[in-house]
């Protein structure tokens, strides 16, 4: 722990953390895209699989899945990253069209919230237009096609987006 009370990993610690993150994200991708387990359920199952696979199985699974760049929630695999112009949804301005890039892992722990996000199509790859911001209610309204929905800022600040053209 350093002077700022932050934990710094050794090179070996970083390697191990990246390995676990890769196993977890790969398991989520496999469960969702190959086995058809719903997007909002794969996180809890991946926690079990990430510790139960050997390096050989991980290598073969990655090859079988054609080396995905992200998990189903948009989290980049180690070695990949979000676009540099990525920001969080709560920073999107009225009238702005954005594409969802990633739902941060903190939100993945709530299946109920993920179900709501899926129902509203607030998932990686989907485009939304920001309609209005209601600071008094700490929320914003967004629209996709004909569907409008209100989203609290404390959720929107955990969704990474990029601005796109209409």
Give short role names for the model-derived ranges.
Residues 1-2, 133:
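Generic beta-strand structural signal
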Residues 5-24:
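Basic, amphipathic "hinge/linker" alpha-helix immediately C-terminal to the N-terminal HTH DNA-binding motif
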Residues 25-69:
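Amphipathic alpha-helical dimerization/coiled-coil segments
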Residues 44, 48, 146, 166:
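Electropositive, surface-exposed helix/loop patches at the edges of structured domains
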Residues 51-158:
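Mid-protein regulatory/catalytic core that forms ligand/cofactor-binding pockets
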Residues 156-166:
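Short, charged, intrinsically disordered terminal tails
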